[in-house]
């Protein structure tokens, strides 16, 4: 490896993220700070949670719903459906905006080891709005791609009602290909988005600029990014398992919005810290601690060679050369 190139590791940033999580949440433990950071984490993951579905007597319930709908005038039913669809779209867009703003609040809480809402909400307004609009555009592109990609499956079914019964293999392959393509695109966007947030926080740039920077970085270091992505998937699966166990252990209390985030806050802080510490290895332009390092973070962050001299000035400067003898 060239001496000027950074050494990119996977497990070392994870270990440092674990130490950072302990510093932020447990050393010392502050309930108010925990609740504030939990709120920022909840906003940053708004709309990403799930729930439980209890499917008993589902057929009887659907029959009652159909009977009720059949008694409603057709024009009124169509109007109600249109209003409901518009309301759902507005809620989705609102959640996406709050989530975009919350991402920068959560990163700020981790980077500066504090529980703050108002200051990062105002300070990163432009970046949050830019990221929201860009994410909305990406979501629309993904929906259009899914619709276009599903046409070879949907059109034959519309034209021929017996198509499903006579072309089992084609239907299965088409559905599997669509699911695989969407999972791949969603994983790619998740990877890019997590790094975009760090770049936008550090450089205070627009989302389109951060997207260009991150995609160029991924193209330059494909091997390291692939390892990171695989390790992050393992962490995500482990987090989902822990979340399920916590939900069962707390009698579904952990499934309540915000409450579950507060209970599982160490996991959210750990995952976000790991992403920030990993991309930090590529240089000061990707380092959210480049301009400010909390003093309590110095023992952890100084172990990375990518920390610039401006964020942690050396206490032992090199000795000055001896004075020249006078002639």
Report the location of each language-model feature.
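Hydrophobic transmembrane alpha-helix segments characteristic of membrane transport
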Residues: 97-126
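Long, highly hydrophobic alpha-helical transmembrane signal-anchor segments
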Residues: 51-84, 147-179
């Amino acid at each position: 490896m060239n001496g000027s190139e950074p050494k990119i590791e996977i497990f070392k940033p994870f270990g440092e993220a674990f130490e950072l999580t302990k510093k932020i949440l447990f050393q010392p433990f502050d309930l108010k700070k925990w609740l504030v950071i939990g709120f920022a984490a909840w906003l940053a993951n708004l709309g990403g949670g799930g729930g439980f579905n209890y499917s008993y007597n589902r057929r009887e319930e659907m029959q009652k719903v159909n009977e009720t709908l059949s008694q409603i005038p057709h024009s009124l039913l169509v109007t109600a459906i249109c209003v409901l669809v518009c309301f759902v779209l507005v809620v989705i867009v609102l959640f996406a905006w709050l989530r975009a703003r919350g991402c920068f609040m959560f990163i700020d809480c981790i980077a500066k080891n504090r529980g703050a809402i108002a200051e990062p909400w105002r300070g990163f307004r432009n970046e949050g709005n830019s990221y929201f609009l860009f994410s909305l555009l990406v979501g629309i592109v993904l929906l259009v791609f899914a619709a276009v990609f599903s046409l070879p499956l949907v059109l034959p079914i519309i034209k021929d009602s017996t198509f499903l019964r006579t072309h089992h293999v084609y239907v299965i392959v088409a559905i599997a290909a669509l699911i695989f393509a969407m999972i791949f695109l969603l994983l790619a966007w998740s990877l890019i988005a997590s790094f975009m947030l760090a770049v936008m926080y550090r450089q205070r740039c627009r989302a389109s600029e951060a997207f260009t920077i991150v995609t160029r970085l991924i193209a330059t270091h494909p091997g390291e990014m692939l390892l990171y992505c695989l390790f992050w998937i393992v962490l995500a699966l482990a987090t989902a398992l822990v979340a399920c166990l916590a939900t069962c252990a707390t009698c579904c209390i952990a499934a309540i919005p915000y409450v579950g985030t507060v209970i599982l806050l160490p996991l959210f802080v750990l995952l976000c810290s790991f992403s920030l510490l990993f991309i930090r290895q590529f240089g000061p332009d990707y380092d959210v601690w480049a301009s400010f390092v909390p003093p309590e973070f110095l023992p952890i962050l100084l172990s990375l060679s990518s920390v610039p001299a401006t964020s942690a000035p050396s206490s032992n400067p090199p000795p000055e050369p001896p004075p020249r003898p006078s002639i």
